[in-house]
């Protein structure tokens, strides 16, 4: 599979829009599982160490797509965790606020991408607005890379440069190795839904490994 890697892109003095998967579970305003956030850190630190401005972007949950702020689905709890890990302040902006900034901070984050009308429909207008936020688009949200949304695929069409982040590259490399070295059919199951267990039991008589 051919794609451009983050390590192959010149980042110095550029602005970067980084699509992550920060869709972490939240209860009473606190993140209860930080794994996805921690897995995003290597790509974030790689970029901010290159003397450039960085905008983080992610979805959270399934809010109504109506261009309005919905507190239940705000990325604020996620931002708090990121600030603790990176030991720096990370301002949270709406798309409109980011578009009005004359000079963007070293690092900032766009509020929940699913707040905006056109995200799930891969709207051309929204995709274009997102691409205008930065010089380079970096896709590092492996868990949502199968979705043709404005913030995952649409933005790539209009970006000056686009590449795969460190996590996405790691996952794709692992999948390629499995596929290349397999001598029989392979089924890869993902997710944490109990309903998938029945499928595993059904396939048990014919499988070699789960």
Could you say what each language-model-derived stretch is?
Residues 1-203, 207:
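Active-site loop-to-helix "anion-binding N-cap" substructures in soluble metabolic enzymes
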């Amino acid at each position: 599979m051919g794609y451009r890697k983050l390590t192959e892109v010149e980042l110095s003095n550029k602005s970067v829009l980084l699509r992550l998967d920060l869709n972490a579970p939240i209860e009473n305003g606190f993140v209860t599982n930080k794994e996805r956030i921690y897995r995003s850190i290597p790509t974030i630190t790689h970029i901010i160490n290159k003397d450039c401005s960085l905008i983080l972007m992610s979805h959270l949950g399934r809010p109504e797509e109506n261009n309005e702020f919905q507190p239940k689905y705000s990325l604020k709890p996620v931002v708090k965790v990121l600030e603790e890990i990176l030991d720096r302040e990370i301002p949270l902006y709406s798309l409109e606020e980011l578009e009005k900034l004359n000079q963007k901070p070293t690092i900032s984050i766009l509020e929940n991408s699913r707040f905006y009308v056109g995200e799930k429909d891969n709207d051309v207008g929204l995709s274009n607005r997102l691409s205008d936020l930065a010089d380079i688009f970096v896709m590092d949200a492996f868990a949502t890379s199968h979705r043709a949304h404005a913030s995952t695929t649409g933005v790539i069409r209009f970006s000056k440069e686009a590449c795969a982040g460190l996590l996405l590259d790691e996952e794709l490399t692992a999948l390629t190795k499995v596929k290349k070295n397999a001598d029989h059919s392979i089924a890869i199951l993902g997710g944490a839904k109990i309903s998938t267990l029945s499928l595993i039991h059904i396939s048990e008589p014919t499988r070699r490994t789960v």
